Regions:
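Bacterial N-terminal signal peptides
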Residues: 10-20
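Metal-dependent phosphoester-hydrolase catalytic domains
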Residues: 25-29, 79, 128-132, 186-195, ...
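Extracytoplasmic, non-cytosolic globular domains
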Residues: 52-71, 87-88, 125, 133-237
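Residue-level detector of functionally pivotal "anchor" positions at catalytic/ligand-binding pockets or at interdomain
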Residues: 299-326, 349-355
Length: 355
């Protein structure tokens, strides 16, 4: 993350937030979802409920008025309060895993969404360092179309430097987390409509040497961050105003590029604070993150993909970080060379050699 840049503008941003006048708008004026669109929202609610019943009242009203089809939520602390709140919401259900709980949940509109199954991945202890909260996957139908959504909350903090020799380095942990999830998406969910979202705790627009999302960004024909324009736009549109940065992301696979490019597609960090008296009222009672929403018109997934060897990128060789030819080794930092001339430095945790 751009630590120094963030420090420079944090004080100014905080002052502007503090001086913002109380708005005449209320939570009743909030809106995002429509009946004609698939409306997906990710939101870190910051250890819900941070201010008890006051928080649950606000959050219930916010969720209802935003009218999302699916909410991927992070940092649920009190599961009893969460369940009680959702039970009071008409037409909404929740997904919450039993056993050890990492704060990840879904809330979905049962009138528009048919929940097919939900499960966690990478639950074994060997994955706890890069993925301290096991990714929560939900398979669902919307208007007869099947989609997968993966909710996660990456490890925070760091020093804006990826230490390739230290698996405990915060940036390295986030990079390995992305590698694991990308491998699951490409090996298990290939050809499916998949959405990865959550508080991923880093910037997507950094230079390659410090960008922990390289595994996705290096394959633009397969993956796209729906919130790219937010991340590269002005601070007023970012998801984490307290320490001005954009950390909450929505990534889609190529099966949803057409929808994302649609003329009615919308992606935004929703400014709830303006509808409840200003930022400090919001932060004290709800969260320090803004929800990030994606609204798209879903088209039938009837396209038949025909892959030919012409133009298809395939792996042609591997070297270690010193440039020496070497065989594939699981968990080792390697340089992958492809038939189109591109190269990628990555860690593969697959048991077999990637293609």
């Amino acid at each position: 993350m751009r630590i120094q840049q963030a420090k420079i503008i944090t004080t100014v941003t905080a002052l502007l937030l503090a001086l913002s006048p109380i708005q005449t708008q209320t939570l009743e004026d909030l809106e995002f979802g429509t009946e004609e669109t698939l409306d997906i929202i990710t939101w870190n609610i910051e250890w819900f409920p941070k201010n008890g019943a006051t928080t649950t009242g606000y959050v219930k009203e916010i969720l209802e008025n935003l009218a999302g089809d699916v909410y991927a939520i992070q940092e649920i602390d009190d599961t009893t309060a969460f369940k009680t709140m959702v039970d009071l919401m008409e037409d909404y259900e929740y997904v919450l895993m039993d056993g050890w709980f990492g704060g990840l949940v879904y809330v979905y509109n049962s009138q528009s969404i048919e929940m097919l199954e939900a499960f966690e991945i990478y639950t074994e202890s060997q994955y706890w360092s890069p993925l301290p909260r096991s990714p929560l996957v939900m398979k669902f139908k919307y208007q007869g179309e099947v989609l997968y959504i993966i909710n996660n909350h990456y490890k925070c903090c760091g020093d804006d430097y990826v230490d390739w020799n230290d698996d405990g380095d915060e940036e390295m942990r986030r990079m390995i987390a992305g590698t694991l999830i990308e491998e699951y998406m490409s090996e298990v969910l290939e050809g499916e409509r998949v959405i990865l979202l959550g508080d991923l705790n880093d910037l997507i627009d950094e230079v390659a040497s410090t960008n922990v999302f390289g595994g996705f960004l290096e394959e633009p024909e397969k993956y796209r961050f729906a919130d790219w324009d937010l991340a590269t736009g002005g601070v007023s549109g970012w998801s984490y105003p307290s320490w001005p940065s954009h950390l909450d992301h929505i990534l889609v696979t190529d099966e949803m590029f057409e929808e994302l490019d649609g003329e009615n597609a919308v992606v935004e960090a929703i400014d709830v604070a303006s509808n409840m008296g200003g930022w400090y009222q919001y932060e004290a009672n709800v969260s320090d993150h803004r929800p990030v929403g994606m609204r798209v018109e879903l088209e039938p997934n009837t396209m038949v993909e025909v892959l030919s060897e012409v133009g298809r990128k395939t792996l042609v060789g591997m070297t270690d970080v010193l440039g020496r030819e070497c065989p594939y080794e699981r968990g080792k930092v390697m340089i992958f060379r492809y038939s189109d001339g591109s190269v990628s430095r990555r860690i593969s945790l697959s048991e077999s050699q990637p293609e």
